[in-house]
A protein has these predicted regions:
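Conserved beta-strand-loop surface patch within small alpha/beta domains used
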Residues: 1-76, 85-137
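Conserved, mostly hydrophobic/aromatic
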Residues: 79
């Protein structure tokens, strides 16, 4: 189970809307309490691909985020990105690029701007997708 603060959800949502029509992206990190992962920090990164169909994180920003995680003793949990025109589920490309089965992938759908949908996923080595429980509080 993943827990995300409402304020951090709002940061992700605002960043995604600001970057429309392109996909937005970032990283998530936090602390573990048994099987629970508490997201303590979201990182808002530049999508250097500048497209609405896929993303690549700015490598300098990505490195700075990882350094910040280490400095603050946070565990890297995975990444997040938006789908401006498609549902909150991993695309075939998302599955193909999911190289680490131990991390979580958060996808924010903006298909309906009045009802954005954020979901968390696990993608295993065989590219099977399961929904991870995500609590926003």
């Amino acid at each position: 189970m993943l827990t995300l603060k409402k304020a951090d959800y709002e940061k992700i949502l605002a960043h995604a809307k600001e970057n429309l029509p392109e996909e937005a992206c970032g990283l998530i990190a936090g602390t573990k309490d048994g099987d629970k992962k508490i997201i303590e920090k979201v990182y808002l990164l530049e999508n250097v691909d500048h497209t609405n169909e896929h993303f690549s994180m700015n490598p300098k920003e990505q490195l700075a985020a990882v350094k910040d995680m280490r400095t603050n003793h946070l565990v890297p949990f995975g990444n997040w990105h938006s789908h401006p025109e498609s549902p909150s589920r991993p695309s075939e490309e998302d599955k193909r690029l999911a190289y680490d089965p131990t991390v979580n992938y958060l996808i924010l759908s903006l298909m309906d701007m009045d009802q954005p949908v954020l979901k968390a996923f696990d993608i295993d080595k065989e590219k099977n997708v399961t929904i991870e429980e995500l609590v926003i509080q």
